[in-house]
């Protein structure tokens, strides 16, 4: 059994900004949400500055970096403009993701194999700047191995297909996707990569995946913002932290 590391919770506050932007103005404030999440136990804050600025804005990233006490994870497409902005903000970490304007949310993992020549310079620039790079990828061996070759310190495994299969009550696909995640986490750790996971996670799936000892960080947003409408963001963060701790305890007890 691989030794377990502490499991961090990164709270994605994008959809606080989605609500704000529905009417314009400054409320609800994503930075206030980030501070609330941290007070409730979040280990870091994730925000995605999309090229179309549909939720998070440039000023949000600058304020988050200046005002929060925990690490900022800057999600972004690996475009020259976004690389320039991120280097200016100097977050603790960046997560490179695929991005299409017509999508409602990030729909798949980054094609590191196909885009290795364009990704390599960006990864190198962030490494040189002391900004931790993670690549948001499917649990595919070729993608994981290429991430290691490009000297990305970390990957974030895309858990969306697994979570969708659970929602759609497709047990065979659930089992298949879970096997891919388990194998991918083990391969990534053996390749020297720090392993994160995210997309579509809720209390139950976060508790399940927390039992994988290789995974050291979960980034969760949409579900938590939805739950916060009913019980408040602070209570939602505490409940998610508890779910993760229950899952992690199964590793410790094993």
UniProtKB/Swiss-Prot annotation:
The active site is at 48 (proton acceptor), 75 (proton acceptor), 199 (proton donor). The keyword Methyltransferase does not apply. Its EC number is 2.6.99.2. The keyword Glycoprotein does not apply. 1-deoxy-D-xylulose 5-phosphate binds at residues 14-15, 50, 55, 105. Gene3D superfamilies: Aldolase class I. Pathway: Cofactor biosynthesis; pyridoxine 5'-phosphate biosynthesis; pyridoxine 5'-phosphate from D-erythrose 4-phosphate: step 5/5. Keywords: Cytoplasm, Pyridoxine biosynthesis, Transferase. 3-amino-2-oxopropyl phosphate binds at residues 12, 23, 200, 221-222. It is an enzyme of class 2 (transferase). It comes from the Bacteria. SUPFAM superfamilies: Pyridoxine 5'-phosphate synthase. It catalyses: 3-amino-2-oxopropyl phosphate + 1-deoxy-D-xylulose 5-phosphate = pyridoxine 5'-phosphate + phosphate + 2 H2O + H(+). The record marks 156 as: Transition state stabilizer. It is found in: Cytoplasm. GO terms for cellular component: cytosol. One of its GO terms (molecular function) is pyridoxine 5'-phosphate synthase activity. One of its GO terms (biological process) is pyridoxine biosynthetic process. Catalyzes the complicated ring closure reaction between the two acyclic compounds 1-deoxy-D-xylulose-5-phosphate (DXP) and 3-amino-2-oxopropyl phosphate (1-amino-acetone-3-phosphate or AAP) to form pyridoxine 5'-phosphate (PNP) and inorganic phosphate. Homooctamer; tetramer of dimers. Belongs to the PNP synthase family. This is Pyridoxine 5'-phosphate synthase. The gene is pdxJ.
